[in-house]
């Protein structure tokens, strides 16, 4: 079963699919090894890990596809992949969908921001017209080859134009053929409940630590009607703090010996990365030497 079909199966059989965010292939491998349902490839995290820059639309489609391919290979579970605005108009979206599908992702996320886009919890976002985004969604739906490959439409209208506009767009995007609707940055549980009372089908909740939406437990999100929860920032925030603490300790203490209890061991890391499997392959296919 391909990962897109697996994702559809998960959504049809589970009440809640939890997808932690991966900012690189190593993170995706850890998430998959820990038994989570899916991985979310975060554009926010790709900008930071690949460029050392904030999420303001600097990555190209080619760069994002390469990152998606590596994350898919490492994860071993379905990948929901951020594709920003689709990198242009409906014509650009068609190529983006083809490339993401070939990369093996299960779900592509397209949003209705104006290029260059910004993180969905930053101020200063602008959105395209509802009609333009509907056209882009229709182009995405018509372009996919595998019918199990899912199109997720995100609207950033809540912050720029209010919850009513966001709901109107969510309904329009669903009618245009989107499989999953993602209304970004609702402000409070009442708005979150209203989203799920209004939008038919699958909906996604975005849990950003320090963002505009309250952090709720997955059981609470499920009770509100959500089907998928993503955690796009948690891994990279924890990793960043750990690195700051580590290198501060080295600068102050002239050694890393004092922070070894915060690290995985050499063997633990190699096990997580799958070294034993590589050794088995080397043994099975080794020629005489």
Curated annotation (Swiss-Prot):
Enzyme class: lyase
Superkingdom of origin: Bacteria
Needed co-factor(s): Mg(2+)
Gene Ontology biological process terms, A to Z: nicotinate catabolic process
UniProt keyword terms in alphabetical order: Lyase, Magnesium, Metal-binding
PROSITE patterns: ISOCITRATE_LYASE (PS00161)
GO MF annotation terms: 2,3-dimethylmalate lyase activity; metal ion binding
Record-linked InterPro entries: ICL/PEPM, Isocitrate_lyase_ph_CS, Pyrv/PenolPyrv_kinase-like_dom, Pyrv_kinase-like_dom_sf
Activity regulation, per record: Completely inhibited by propionic anhydride and by cystamine. Irreversibly inhibited by the mercapto reagents iodoacetate and iodoacetamide. Unaffected by hydroxylamine.
Pathway in which this enzyme or protein is active: Cofactor degradation; nicotinate degradation; propanoate and pyruvate from 6-hydroxynicotinate: step 8/8
E.C. no: 4.1.3.32
Pfam family, one: PEP_mutase
Family label: Belongs to the isocitrate lyase/PEP mutase superfamily.
Function: Catalyzes the formation of proponate and pyruvate from (2R,3S)-2,3-dimethylmalate. Has no activity toward dimethylmaleate, malate, citramalate, isocitrate and citrate.
Stated name of the protein: 2,3-dimethylmalate lyase
Organism: Eubacterium barkeri
Lineage: Bacteria, Bacillati, Bacillota, Clostridia, Eubacteriales
């Amino acid at each position: 079963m391909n990962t897109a079909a697996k994702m559809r199966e998960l959504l049809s059989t589970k009440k809640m699919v939890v997808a932690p965010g991966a900012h690189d292939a190593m993170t995706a491998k850890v998430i998959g090894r820990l038994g989570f349902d899916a991985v979310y490839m975060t554009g926010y995290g790709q900008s930071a890990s690949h460029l050392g820059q904030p999420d303001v639309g600097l990555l190209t489609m080619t760069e994002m596809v390469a990152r998606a391919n590596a994350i898919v290979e490492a994860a071993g579970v379905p990948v929901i992949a951020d594709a920003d605005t689709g990198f242009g108009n409906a014509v650009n979206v068609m190529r983006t969908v083809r490339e993401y599908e070939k990369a093996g992702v299960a779900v592509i996320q397209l949003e209705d921001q104006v290029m260059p886009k910004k993180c969905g919890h930053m101020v200063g976002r602008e959105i395209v017209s509802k009609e333009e985004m509907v056209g882009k969604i229709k182009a995405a739906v018509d372009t996919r080859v595998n019918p199990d490959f899912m199109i997720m439409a995100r609207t950033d209208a809540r912050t720029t134009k209010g919850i009513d506009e966001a709901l109107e767009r969510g309904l329009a995007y669903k009618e245009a053929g989107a499989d999953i609707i993602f209304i970004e940055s609702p402000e409070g549980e009442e708005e979150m409940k209203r989203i799920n009372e209004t939008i038919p089908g699958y909906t996604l909740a975005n849990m950003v630590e320090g963002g505009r939406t309250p952090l709720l437990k997955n059981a609470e999100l499920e009770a509100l009607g959500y089907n998928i929860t993503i955690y796009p920032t948690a891994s990279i925030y924890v990793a960043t703090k750990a690195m700051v603490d580590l290198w501060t300790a080295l600068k102050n203490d002239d050694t890393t010996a004092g922070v070894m209890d915060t690290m995985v061991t050499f063997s633990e890391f190699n096990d997580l990365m799958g070294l034993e499997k590589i050794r088995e392959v080397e043994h099975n296919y080794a020629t005489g030497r």
